[in-house]
Amino acid sequence: VQRIPLPPAPMLASAAPPPADTTGYCFEAKWDGIRLLARCAERVELFSRQATNLTTCFPEIVDALSAGLEGRTAILDGELVAFDHHARPNFQLIQRRLRAPRPGPRLLASVPLTFCVFDIIYLDGHDLTGHTYLQRRRMLDDLRLHKPPIVISPYWTGIGTDAMAEIMRGLGLEGYVLKHAHSTYQPGRRSAAWIKHVVRQRRPMVVGGFIPSAGTHRGGLGALLVGAYDTNGELRYCGHVGAGMTPRTRASLMERLSDLQQPLTPFAAPIPELRGARWVRPTVVVDIEYRQFTGRLRHPALKSVLIDADSSGISLPPEG
């Protein structure tokens, strides 16, 4: 019986500026999910990036790979993704599945998953890590595994970084990964041959409060509490923003917000318990950059304070 090795630690992409000339590179979508390696032999086993065995968590992926490979042996590398009703990846949905080591029919139906496969590092007794990216992709395509819940993640060539960023932003995806066409698979290495680039969204937000800073800068501005108006005209809390502010910006905002303080929150219920929060009249508008909105802003940062902006016209961003 052929012995299939356990999956190695996956190759990782570097966070670096994309090259000005992308000749010789291939673009892939950056999925907002969890890295998954599939060891496909007599039975299929699934492993996380940290080598945790997740086989029982995702039985639909196991069944689909068993049927699709028809007895062939392989180690596949990809991303496990949960898509919301807008067809956009939603990381919170995957978290629900991870909390259930043996999901029941109801959870399987309510949170379906997709395994987006983007690499193959072993096939029918052959180690493919020394093959080039394009060679491995052709072998992966030849397996014809593209049947839900398995998707062969597409790749693109001959496109610029700005155009690719715009496409990813339009699709509501996290960003893209650039992979050199001649790169070999380097297990466990964060390689410069793969470059990840996160595409971020921008949106005006209304400041409804702030949290003073603690520690060395006690009494200064720690974080802004921001929100936007729903269709009923109520100000909804969207999150706190502490990144992206220079000392000068913090000082000028603190001076401005201090004059706008009021005893009651301007945000409609429910809002989380925000220790030390100070509330203000919702007249200041700021430009916020963020990765994703899921009812809360993910990885927000302040870009600028908008002068003379009408705070009443700031609506909630779409989720996803």
Q: Model regions: which residues?
A:
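Catalytic cores of nucleic-acid ligases and guanylyltransferases
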Residues: V1-G320
